[in-house]
């Protein structure tokens, strides 16, 4: 963590689902708090496990359980357990998955406590669904908006589609709140991500 601080990092992101699923880490995170456990004094954001569902398939986790765990660990920014909509998902199925994600965001908004809330924007490759998701999320008290479900586009170098997804999402978002691009960790993408806002 010292090296991160020396490089100028001001905050870090880790994964609450992975911590939760490891009994030793789970116990330590609740007992000590996430900041002490990781040895990091700055802001900590946790993801909810949604990406693991993309990588491994179905995950065994309830949205309210992982939200509560993020609060118990004392994270600064917790993330809603959204539904990862794959880019190839057809419109009807993507719409159903988006409805579930929106329901979870609304429930988390009511139960976030003092924790800042990240409300992921989903919708697959369907630009109208992305805009709809962003507009609905902006009507909640969520504190920031990660654009999710885009890692496959990055991995396949589909940068035009990535830009279309981001711009369609951003058109519906409240411009006074920050936007995060989930999965954008490769330096090659940083300039594009900054350009997209």
For each feature predicted by the language model, list its residue ranges.
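Non-catalytic, usually N-terminal nucleic-acid engagement modules in DNA/RNA processing proteins
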Residues: 1-113
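Glycine-rich phosphate/ribose-binding loops and adjacent secondary-structure elements
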Residues: 99, 111-197
């Amino acid at each position: 963590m010292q090296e991160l601080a020396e490089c100028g990092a001001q905050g870090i992101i880790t994964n609450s689902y992975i911590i939760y699923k490891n009994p030793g880490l789970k116990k330590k995170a609740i007992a000590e708090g996430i900041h002490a456990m990781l040895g990091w004094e700055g802001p900590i954001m946790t993801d909810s496990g949604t990406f693991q569902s993309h990588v491994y398939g179905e995950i065994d986790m309830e949205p309210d359980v992982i939200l509560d765990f993020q609060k118990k660990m004392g994270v600064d920014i917790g993330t809603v357990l959204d539904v990862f909509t794959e880019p190839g998902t057809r419109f009807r199925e993507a719409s159903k998955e988006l409805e579930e994600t929106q329901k979870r965001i609304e429930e988390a908004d009511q139960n976030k406590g003092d924790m800042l809330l990240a409300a992921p924007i989903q919708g697959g490759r369907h630009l109208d669904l992305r805009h709809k998701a962003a507009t609905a999320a902006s009507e909640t008290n969520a504190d920031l908006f990660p654009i999710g479900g885009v890692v496959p586009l990055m991995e396949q170098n589909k940068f035009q589609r990535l830009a279309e997804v981001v711009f369609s999402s951003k058109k519906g978002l409240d411009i006074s709140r920050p936007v995060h691009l989930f999965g954008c960790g490769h330096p090659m993408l940083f300039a594009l991500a900054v350009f997209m806002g």
